[in-house]
């Protein structure tokens, strides 16, 4: 069972939608304005790419809110997600489960390769199916939030008429945009790009994409590694497991970084491509 196939009552869906709207409000008016800026640009390859970028931004915004909405539904319907790890042994709670042990026992775990379930409270590798899906929802929301910021930076790159290159919403690229526009809007965008919060979010996304994913207790045991260095000192590699509240906070923060950047970006686009009456 996936969270979106569960039979939630209309009352529950309305309540969770209200909670989503409160915590992750839709930037509807800015999305409409951004679309109108590029909708009637004369036909050209650049205009076509701009319109596709803006359509991507629109759809990704809805996708992020969908994932965060599903996460809220899971926290509401599966309270074990919020309580995960409370009853753990102190050693497991403090350090995690040795990764070597998890890998050695992998072949002996009952139904270890099962990925489809009809009960979200089913145990799975030390967590629950609901917790496993919950973490995936947050990871997907974070991934999309960084992706939509990169597309937003590309739209602004076209507006600045800068030579095309690989564009990302990072401080180096946004500095070039600020040099081109030298505006209050790009100064705001630069503060976002240079901020500790966005860089933390990007580091999380990069770990997920390229190196080591984060773990949460709700989705299973956190892997523990330890060894001795060249000086004989014990080294313990143990990343603290994320709890559900902090994971949702990460997803929400990622989304709100995008919506904060969207407002000044739309202002820039309205000046570059005035909305036609």
Regions found by a protein language model. Give the residues of each.
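Extracellular acidic loop/turn motifs
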Residues: 151
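Short, positively charged
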Residues: 148
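Acidic, Ser/Thr/Gly/Pro-rich intrinsically disordered interaction regions
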Residues: 1-139, 143, 154-277
């Amino acid at each position: 069972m996936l969270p979106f196939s569960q039979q939630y009552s209309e009352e529950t869906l309305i309540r969770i939608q209200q909670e989503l709207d409160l915590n992750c409000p839709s930037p509807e008016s800015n999305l409409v304005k951004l679309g109108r800026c590029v909708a009637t640009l004369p036909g050209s390859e650049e205009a076509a790419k701009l319109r596709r970028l803006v359509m991507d931004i629109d759809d990704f915004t809805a996708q992020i809110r969908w994932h965060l909405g599903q996460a809220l539904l899971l926290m509401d319907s599966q309270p074990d997600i919020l309580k995960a790890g409370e009853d753990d042994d102190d050693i497991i709670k403090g350090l995690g489960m040795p990764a070597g042990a998890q890998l050695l026992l992998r072949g002996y775990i009952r139904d270890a390769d099962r990925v489809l379930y009809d009960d979200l409270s089913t145990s799975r590798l030390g967590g629950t199916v609901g917790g496993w899906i919950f973490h995936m929802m947050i990871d997907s929301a974070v991934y999309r939030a960084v992706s939509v910021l990169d597309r937003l930076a590309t739209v602004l790159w076209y507006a600045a008429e800068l030579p095309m290159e690989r564009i990302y919403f990072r401080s180096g690229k946004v500095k070039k945009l600020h040099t081109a526009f030298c505006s209050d809007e790009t100064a705001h965008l630069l503060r976002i790009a240079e901020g500790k919060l966005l860089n933390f979010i990007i580091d999380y996304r990069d770990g997920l994409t390229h190196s080591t994913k984060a773990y949460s207790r709700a989705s299973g045991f956190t892997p523990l590694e330890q060894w001795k260095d060249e000086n004989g000192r014990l080294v313990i590699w143990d990343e603290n497991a994320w709890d559900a509240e902090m994971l949702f906070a990460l997803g929400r923060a990622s989304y709100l970084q995008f919506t904060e950047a969207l407002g000044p970006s739309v202002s820039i686009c309205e000046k570059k491509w005035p909305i036609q009456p």
